[in-house]
Amino acid sequence: MNGIKNIKFIKWSNLIKLKIKKKIFYWAPFLTPIATPKAVINSAYSLQKYSNEFDCSIINFFGEFNIFKKDIVNKNIKIYNSSFNILRKYLPFKGKIKSRFSFLIIFILSFLPLRKLLSEERPDYLIVQLITSLPMFLVLIFNFNTKFILRISGIPRVSFFRKLLWKIALKKFYLITCPTESTMQYIKSLNIVDDDKIKVLFDPIIEVKKIKSETNKKNNTISHNNYCLAVGRLTKQKNFIFLCKAFKKVVTKYPNAKLLIAGDGEDKEKIDSYIIKNKLEENIITLGYIKNIFPLMYGAKLFILSSLWEDPGFVLIEASFCRTPTLTSNCETGPIELIKDKKNG
């Protein structure tokens, strides 16, 4: 009976607090600021904010997430850095051939470190979003206790080799998620994985407080009125040359029409050259990368998305949240599920 006095009773609430959280790692190396890293950060933040069951970490292999470090730290998301943390400064990223070369370097250098990290840290889940071939090879060659989840956005080009790799590797994946219904149906049509493994999972995009705060900040370096706005990487996907050609026709009818293009990328010289050649410098203005786009987005008379494909199109959702009228191309995925003609765009 005396021994009973020494027993310490623990409340159920304390037991819940002591519950071991499931570890989720994100693998999404990128070369240029695109929508995916924002999706990664928002996903990790949302899981930790709205659930006590998960502990999220982002793998920052070659310093790609350094530009988001402040945001990641503020959201209490862990970062796993590698010894190649400053490699991003030296990797070429403009141009298809140069970027492919950089991805090959990343694949080779990260093969063993990623295997070691997964073996030592033993995360419950690894969410794979970019350079997906590396985790696929790892899961084929080695055995992990980690459940691999593949995130597929857009309509990926499926060569014979890629289709073969996916068909073999995805048998060992736990889940495949897509941000839109269209993409999910496309992946199902490839017959590379059981339909039961493929799910639609919408990206957490809108941070209401942040957008309202950013919108109220003034950008002293940019001052424009009565303008249309387009935002995105200056690449083939965003189709800005087509947009410039279309806007040229608008200018012939409305000489004071103005289009601002915010973004940077491999097609910048081509776009600038077209603008100069057609004497549109007063009508079409390239701004470069704008860190806080919301004041411009909020002030635009019209937001234009000219992309060849999107999934789902983050900027389109953000523009809609800012109550800015939208005009979008009819992409295979994304906009067609977001915009109803003559209702919200």
Give the location of each predicted region.
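N-terminal strand-loop element at the rim of the active site
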Residues: 12, 27-34, 46, 50-101
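A conserved mid-protein helix/loop that constitutes part of the nucleotide-sugar donor-binding site
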Residues: 37-42, 226-249, 259, 266-272, ...
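Short His-centered aromatic/hydrophobic patch
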Residues: 107-110, 128-134, 152
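Short beta-strand->alpha-helix junction loop in the catalytic core
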Residues: 155-156, 183, 201-212, 233, ...
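Acidic anion/phosphate-binding donor-loop and adjacent secondary structure
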Residues: 160-161, 185-189, 202-224, 295
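A short, active-site helix/loop in glycosyltransferases that binds the activated sugar's phosphate group
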Residues: 173-198, 205-207
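Aromatic "clamp/platform" in nucleotide-sugar-dependent glycosyltransferases that forms part
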Residues: 289, 308
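Short hydrophobic beta-strand element within catalytic cores of glycosyltransferases
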Residues: 325-329
